[in-house]
Amino acid sequence: MEFLQTSRRRNIFGDLMHIALNLALVCMVFAVMYVGQRAEIALILIMLSKWRVFAVRWRYWRVNILANLVDFTVGFGVVALLYLAAGSGSSHTLWLQVGVSIFFALWLVVIKPRTRALASKVQAGTALFIGSWALAAFSHDIGQIATVIFYLGMGYGAARHVLVAADDKHYSLLASVFALVLAELGWVTYHWNIGYGLSLLGGFMLPQMAIITLCVGVIAERLYQTIIAKASFSQPRISVPVIACTVVVLVLVLFVSSTGPGLYPNQTII
């Protein structure tokens, strides 16, 4: 009994230390971006926080990197959003960066540690949303080829994350198919870049493609569940999300869109 109590105390202490270190990372990233807008230092901090990925023999790096693509996507995406908030020209820059930092803290402490199947879907969806937001915002800074490649990696990582949690034997093939679909969205993002925002937030806008990418991910996951579980599409848990996401995409593309090159070239300001 005494051993169990000691072990429990150690586990609690370890959990508290893990939370404290994650919150320290959030504070350091926020400070670096708010004070000096040094995105490269913030990215280095994100990489250093993933030291365990590389703390093995080099031949295991590929597996570890693929297994952590979702976490890398969110981390790099948060840095991009902090940078976007800093250059938004809004009088609420501080609060925008605080909001992004609070989200990052929730990701590290609450969302990321979960291991259930539903949690893996939430994690993958978060990566798709944050990653596509960042890529849409900076697509014309990094170029068309880089945008497509990053979309490809983001799609593979998100799909792999869900499929591995579901113990699918063909996860690599299926993840590659989804990655190709997202690569196409990456190409579209470069040429069709529209943002929605509030006038008081300045250039800090929500890209249309972030919403569309998330909807595509939800549709793909629900259709995958239909095939795997041999369920009928008429079941509400399958049909409702698919129909809702399809309607959202159609409304955005047909009624709230206009095309043109550039960073949020046709901005919808509320």
PLM segments and residue spans:
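Hydrophobic alpha-helical transmembrane segments in multi-pass integral membrane proteins
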Residues: V79-A86, W133-I145, A183-L198, V248-G262
